């Protein structure tokens, strides 16, 4: 925290386009396969991105009653509870996504800040450490709230510099994906060699 404070005097609250809010609760009767909205639960963001296919569909009646709890492109959804999930984030990248976020998450909408840069920052050891030391409760009953998160430091660098860093991250991710593909190819070759030996 002190190291971040030396880097920036700005807080998340200084870059919010609107207050951070918690999501909506749901009951089994609210699910409806004929609905148009996905329910963004903690389980759907546990892999650091929104898993569209695993998200339940809620009824249109429910969705209409929770219109203030919807998401749009560039929103960041932060899990606020659960021992293994608290602090995990997902960036909403689909402009056409219709979604309602769960009450155990919070929605962060930023202005004058690159949302993807913020997303990667929220994934850093620094930010996750802040979640760890400021969360309340024990085990799966741990929680953190918007009033706390809004006061966390946020790196204050020009947007063009944020974009440069995001591009650098993308390049590194692409390298990693190529390495993974190469390892997979080698594994297949090894499997084939072993299978050939067995079949002789």
Regions found by a protein language model. Give the residues of each.
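Sequence-specific dsDNA recognition surfaces
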Residues: 13-29, 43-73
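Non-catalytic DNA-recognition/assembly elements of restriction-modification systems
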Residues: 1-25, 158-200
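Short coil/turn segments at secondary-structure boundaries
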Residues: 25-34, 133-135
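A short beta-sheet element
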Residues: 41-42, 67-123
